[in-house]
Amino acid sequence: MQVLPATIDRWPDVVTMLGGDLDKGCWCQAWRGRDEVAKAAGESRPETLRRQVQEAAPPPGYLAYIGKDVVGWCGVSVRGRTPRLDGSRTIPKLDDKPVWAIGCFLIRVGYRRRGVATALLAGVVNAAREAGAPGVEAYPIDPVGRRANANFAFVGLASMFDRAGFRRVLETNAHSDHLPRLLVRLDL
């Protein structure tokens, strides 16, 4: 399995992972909020993400491949550059460190439960370390003895972050699948 940054030459693979009805879906804009450029230009979410893929550092996401097939996506942003996340009333901002924040994992049907999310997490951590980020944080759920509903597990499972060396910092007021989301962090 290979994990690569979402770059403009990989845009068709980004569309494969996030696409479908191009006017619906998050397109990894939920935490970012609509920036001033998007508002002024009247961009759609896919147009905004395409611009971010071209311009953003770090890229707004990472893609997982098995052979030539794109099988996963991990949405990434930087705390301090994500207006909706930074101003969230349910997920607190711990400090002013520009840690990389993992917002979501999307794994194609047929590839789930095969280590794709774990590979994406490792790839993002390695990229953050190489870029000199002070840390990586995420907001997963802990289903505690039950299987998480796949529709709500997009935030990741706490056990995966535990295995990757993240520490559980606190339980947030945010929920997914009626479970509280944790704030987990790995200092780099």
Regions found by a protein language model. Give the residues of each.
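Charge-dense, helix-prone N-terminal extensions
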Residues: 1, 12-16, 35-43, 47-49, ...
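A short beta-loop-alpha structural element at the N-terminal edge
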Residues: 2-20, 24-25
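Active-site rim helix/loop that mediates acceptor-substrate recognition in acyltransferases
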Residues: 26-61, 171
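Conserved acyl-donor/pantetheine-binding loop and adjacent beta-alpha core of acyl/acetyltransferases
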Residues: 56, 65, 69-112, 148-155
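Short beta-strand micro-motifs in enzyme catalytic cores
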Residues: 60-62, 98-100, 178-184
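Conserved acetyl-CoA-binding loop-helix of GNAT-fold acetyltransferases
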Residues: 104-107, 113-130
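Conserved GNAT acetyl-CoA-binding A-motif
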Residues: 121, 128-152
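C-terminal "cap" of GNAT-fold acetyltransferases
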Residues: 151-164, 170-188
